[in-house]
């Protein structure tokens, strides 16, 4: 450090400053790369002020005392220690760059210069936020709140006038960034004796250290603190009392001031001395320190002629050491921040359950538990306030910026929940997922996150009801989970239908206008000038037209640019609706007079079948989502080339509609553990998995020893196969364990039991013990275990136990599952008792996750489309071969010719059987799998063959669930969801 430190206080009186800064000026001051290098004469200070030269005289108000070298040795020691600690932190964390922010309201830059110099010596970065002197309290607080939520800033100090130091301003600071120790929380911890957990006022600490370094024994000394207020007064009193001193605080206008000054061994001035108080009231030999706010801010000098007391400590010593101790606090703040970024067990307040028997309805259970405020949950799991967007009290969106903040954090363990071929009633994968995370976090104290799909309102009002889990293992509030949530599906519907409208509108306009008229409307005159938009320039580049001036295109280029020449018979993009409506499966559009006879047959799909939903589920960033949306192929032109959303010029608008939907939704389980609900593609007509982004964020938040449990739709043959071959390819993530959910009910069905129909009471075979049916049906469980083993991932079977299941049936299933190759098989009782009922499953999953995964894909994406379809049909479904319809073969040829042959396959098939026939239970054999059609989701990144007759728009049953759904108009409570 050498000669630089003595230069800092060459002047205590500053020359007149230039006019105040603008309303807000942020001046970043990057730290120097080295430590010592002496200060050079004429070196420019912050904001263009010249530092004092070595030869400049010190102000006459600085009275002798100890030599500058002796004074600076204390500061040098503090700064050197801070520098060494920071260097060690950066050795282990090279990307760590601690930043101190200083909010300055005024034009006096003395303290600013001191802080800058010392920060440079220690290796810190400083950002100054310069505000005018007349800034209001509200303006100061606004700046504080911005810095509080800036993850790049690790410490915050205020350099403002004393009249702005209100409780409201001081307590606006985040305690963990309050390096001056002025907030009530830091002061409270200091008073309580937890100095190691808080920041101590650098000024108060400087006073103590200077006294002790000067050889003053504080034990038994009478300390008088005069004119101090607020945080400084409290900190001084607390620190002096810790040293055994008798401390008294007094104000300047107190009657007994003269006698108290006369009795004191040490006097600490907390505010400027009034002119009428003579210095002669202080006994010669008394140690005096000036800590007044005006002096520390450089606004006043030493005042009238001085008495040289025997134990005088120079005022500038307090300034300089306080600044050094602020740097020390700053380094401590950075160290604490790094520690917070490392894996730790969450300090999660779990909600207690009081299970009832018989188990009430799902909505009664949900309503009986009061959820935590979602901002509290977010803080518990390590999210920052600026990383969440709160919707009401119980749900929030999480911003993708958390991935950047935690990019160096190791991922947790990744668990997939799949199932055997289900009954139409479902076998409880969501319930198992939630029960498992409740067991891990609430009962085993392991960080865990559930990642679930958002349910479509179609099935919610149709046949299935809610999808928030069930019993004492569900997401709450379940009515918010099952209905609109945060509007993601509505955003998808709007974006999808905007694109559909753009397609038909473009066909109409191209069919009714000349090339020139079309071009002039696509590139209109604005203020006499034609300009291409950004997306139009991209289309020109795609067409090989290297021009940017609309007036320079030839007639041929104008025609090429203006006409997409869409072949209506090749349009694959359909309108969508989030309602089960069978009468929209085939419609005619364009029959109005204004459409001039340009009508065609079309259809509606369920909203979650939209390719935009698949894009949302597979994207990993906003930029990636925009690129995927632009690549979506909606049709072919009349020469057989693909037409994309980019060609239609609608990509930017789609991205705007989806910009909030890309953020995962945070909710909680009944026991207060975190859940991400994000994206909800169907598993039979899409890839059936929640979003990649939700999984990636959750894996960072749980830490290396934590668990993220996500669910794949329907049976392992559908949802799990697509999870591995599509989602894992897109995300680059590798699962550690598969949990395979089975029920005695479903196994009895596969063993030859009567058909199971939604809304119809179960036959006695399902409610009474029947060992033979269970044993025969375990063939389906064994097949699904074998499918899992194709991918090299250990599998744990979770038997979701119903109240009618017997011990003999349960034991038989677990035994046969282990014989089939399962790592373990565990009965689960979470539905009736919550996470406590899945503790054995949680332990089995932890043990399985400790084993090495030998994950592998089922096929190479570079092989031909037909071969990939055949591999899935034979290896997963057990088919003898496949049969392509002429239409399917033509589509495969077209997609291959267009360059899409290297995409993975997403089979659209019934979920009720391993085959294409829903009534074929167990393990069908020797069947030929018919491929009736093949479609492409180029933006999502897969080809999807349609197996047999697959509807992409469900219908309502005779008695839909909406018969039971109602609203209490007095309490506004939803009734009838189950």
From Swiss-Prot:
UniProt superkingdom: Eukaryota
Modified residues (N6-acetyllysine): 189
Sequence positions that bind ATP: 423-430
Residues covered by region (Disordered): 1-71
Location(s), subcellular: Mitochondrion
Transit peptide feature, positions: 1-31
InterPro entries, per database record: Aminoacid_DH-like_N_sf, Formate_THF_ligase, Formate_THF_ligase_CS, NAD(P)-bd_dom_sf, P-loop_NTPase, THF_DH/CycHdrlase, THF_DH/CycHdrlase_cat_dom, THF_DH/CycHdrlase_NAD-bd_dom
Reaction(s) this enzyme catalyzes, per UniProt: (6S)-5,6,7,8-tetrahydrofolate + formate + ATP = (6R)-10-formyltetrahydrofolate + ADP + phosphate
UniProt note on tissues of expression: Detected in most tissues, highest expression found in placenta, thymus and brain. Low expression is found in liver and skeletal muscle. Up-regulated in colon adenocarcinoma.
Annotated metabolic or biological route of this protein: One-carbon metabolism; tetrahydrofolate interconversion
Modification Phosphoserine occurs at: 357
Feature: compositional bias, Low complexity: 1-10
Keyword annotations from UniProtKB, A to Z: Acetylation, ATP-binding, Ligase, Mitochondrion, Nucleotide-binding, One-carbon metabolism, Phosphoprotein, Transit peptide
Signal sequence residues: none
Keyword Ubl conjugation: no
Modified residues (N6-succinyllysine): 189, 596
Compositional bias annotation for Gly residues: 33-45
Gene Ontology annotations of biological process type: 10-formyltetrahydrofolate biosynthetic process; embryonic neurocranium morphogenesis; embryonic viscerocranium morphogenesis; folic acid-containing compound metabolic process; formate biosynthetic process; formate metabolic process; neural tube closure; tetrahydrofolate interconversion
Subunit architecture: Homodimer.
HAMAP family listed in its UniProt record: FTHFS (MF_01543)
Note: May participate in the progression of colorectal cancer by conferring growth advantage. Could be a new molecular target for cancer therapy.
Domain comment as written in the entry: This monofunctional enzyme consists of two major domains: an N-terminal inactive methylene-THF dehydrogenase and cyclohydrolase domain and an active larger formyl-THF synthetase C-terminal domain.
Function field: May provide the missing metabolic reaction required to link the mitochondria and the cytoplasm in the mammalian model of one-carbon folate metabolism complementing thus the enzymatic activities of MTHFD2.
UniProt protein name: Monofunctional C1-tetrahydrofolate synthase, mitochondrial
Species whose genome carries this gene: Homo sapiens (Human)
């Amino acid at each position: 450090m050498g000669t630089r430190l003595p230069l800092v206080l060459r002047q205590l009186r500053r020359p007149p400053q230039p006019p105040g800064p603008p309303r807000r000026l942020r001046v970043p001051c990057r730290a120097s790369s080295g430590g010592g290098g002496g200060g050079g004469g004429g070196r420019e200070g912050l904001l263009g002020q010249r530092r004092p030269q070595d030869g400049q005289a010190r102000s006459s108000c600085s009275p002798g005392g100890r030599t500058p070298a002796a004074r600076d040795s204390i500061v040098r020691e503090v700064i050197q220690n801070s520098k060494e600690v920071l260097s060690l932190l950066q050795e282990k964390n090279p990307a760590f760059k601690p930043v101190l922010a200083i909010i300055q309201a005024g034009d006096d830059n003395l303290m600013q210069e001191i802080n800058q110099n010392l920060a440079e010596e220690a290796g810190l970065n400083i950002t100054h936020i310069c505000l005018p002197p007349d800034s209001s309290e509200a303006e100061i607080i606004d700046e504080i709140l911005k810095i509080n939520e800036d993850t790049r800033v690790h410490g915050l100090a205020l350099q403002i006038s004393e009249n702005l130091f209100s409780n409201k301003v001081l307590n606006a600071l985040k305690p963990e960034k309050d390096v001056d120790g002025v907030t009530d929380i830091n002061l409270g911890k200091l008073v309580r004796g937890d100095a190691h957990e808080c920041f101590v006022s650098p000024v108060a600490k400087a006073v103590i250290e200077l006294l002790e370094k000067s050889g003053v024994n504080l034990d038994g000394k009478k300390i008088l603190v005069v004119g101090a207020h607020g945080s400084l007064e409290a900190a001084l009193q607390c620190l002096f009392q810790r040293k055994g001193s008798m401390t008294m605080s007094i104000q300047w206008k107190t009657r007994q001031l003269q006698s108290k000054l006369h009795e004191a061994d040490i006097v600490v001035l907390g505010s400027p001395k009034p002119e009428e108080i003579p210095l002669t009231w202080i006994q010669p030999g008394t140690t005096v320190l000036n800590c007044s706010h005006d002096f520390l801010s450089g606004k006043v000098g030493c005042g009238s002629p001085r008495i040289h007391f025997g134990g005088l400590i120079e005022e500038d010593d307090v300034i300089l050491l306080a600044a050094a101790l602020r740097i020390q606090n700053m380094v401590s703040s950075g160290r604490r921040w790094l520690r917070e970024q490392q894996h730790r067990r969450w300090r999660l307040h779990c909600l207690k359950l009081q299970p009832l028997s018989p188990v009430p309805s799902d909505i009664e259970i949900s309503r009986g538990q009061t959820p935590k405020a979602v901002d509290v949950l977010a803080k518990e799991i390590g999210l920052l306030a600026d990383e969440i967007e709160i919707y009401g009290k119980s749900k929030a969106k999480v911003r993708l910026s958390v991935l950047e903040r935690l990019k160096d954090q190791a991922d947790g363990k990744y668990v997939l929940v799949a199932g055997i071929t289900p009954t139409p009633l479902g076998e409880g994968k969501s319930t198992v997922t939630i029960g498992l995370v409740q067991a891990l976090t609430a009962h085993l104290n392991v960080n865990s996150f559930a990642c679930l799909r958002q349910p479509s309102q179609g099935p919610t009002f149709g046949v299935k009801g809610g999808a928030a889990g069930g019993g004492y293992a569900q997401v709450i509030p379940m009515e918010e989970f099952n209905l609109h949530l945060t509007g993601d599906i509505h955003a998808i519907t709007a974006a999808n239908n905007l694109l559909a409208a753009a397609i038909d509108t473009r066909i109409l306009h191209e069919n009714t206008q000349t090339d020139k008229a079309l071009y002039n409307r696509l590139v209109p005159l604005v203020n006499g000038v034609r300009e291409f938009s950004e997306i139009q320039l991209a289309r020109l580049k795609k067409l090989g037209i290297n021009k940017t001036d609309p007036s320079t295109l030839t007639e041929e280029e104008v025609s090429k640019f203006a006409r997409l020449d869409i072949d209506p018979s090749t349009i694959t993009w359909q309108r969508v609706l989030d309602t089960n409506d069978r009468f929209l499966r085939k419609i005619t559009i364009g029959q109005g007079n204004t459409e001039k006879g340009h009508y065609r047959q079309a259809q509606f799909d369920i909203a979650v079948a939209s390719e935009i939903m698949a894009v949302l589920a597979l994207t990993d960033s906003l930029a990636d989502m925009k690129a995927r949306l632009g690549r979506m192929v909606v049709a072919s032109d009349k020469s057989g080339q693909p037409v994309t959303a980019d060609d239609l010029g609608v990509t930017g608008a789609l991205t705007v509609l989806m910009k909030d939907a890309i953020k995962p939704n945070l909710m909680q389980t009944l026991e207060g553990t975190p859940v991400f609900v994000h994206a909800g593609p169907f598993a039979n007509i899409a890839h059936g998995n929640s979003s990649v982004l939700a999984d990636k964020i959750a894996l960072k938040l749980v830490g290396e020893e934590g668990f993220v449990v996500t669910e794949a739709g329907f049976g392992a043959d559908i949802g799990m196969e697509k999870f591995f071959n599509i989602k894992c390819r897109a995300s680059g993530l590798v699962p550690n364990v598969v949990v395979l959910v089975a029920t005695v009910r479903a196994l009895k069905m596969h063993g030859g039991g009567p058909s199971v129909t939604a809304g119809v009471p179960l036959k006695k075979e399902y409610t009474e013990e029947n060992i033979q049916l269970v044993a025969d049906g375990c063939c389906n469980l064994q097949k699904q275990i074998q499918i899992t083993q194709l991918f090299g991932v250990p599998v744990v079977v979770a038997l979701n136990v119903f109240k009618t299941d017997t011990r003999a049936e349960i034991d038989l299933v677990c035994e046969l599952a282990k014989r089939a190759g399962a790592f373990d098989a565990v009965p689960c009782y979470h539905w009736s008792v919550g996470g406590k009922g899945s503790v054995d499953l949680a332990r089995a999953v932890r043990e399985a996750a400790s084993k090495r995964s030998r994950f592998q894909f089922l096929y190479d994406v570079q092989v031909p489309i037909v071969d990939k379809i055949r591999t899935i049909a034979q290896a997963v479904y057990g088919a003898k071969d496949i049969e392509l319809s002429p239409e399917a073969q033509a589509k495969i040829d077209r997609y291959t010719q267009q360059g899409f042959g290297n995409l993975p396959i997403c089979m659209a098939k019934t979920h009720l059987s391993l085959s294409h026939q829903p009534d074929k239970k167990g393990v069908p054999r020797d069947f030929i799998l018919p491929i009736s059609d093949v479609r492409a989701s180029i933006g999502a990144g897969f080809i999807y063959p349609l197996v047999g007759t697959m509807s992409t728009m469900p219908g309502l049953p005779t008695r839909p669930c909406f018969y039971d759904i109602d609203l209490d108009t007095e309490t506004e409570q939803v009734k009838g969801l189950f």
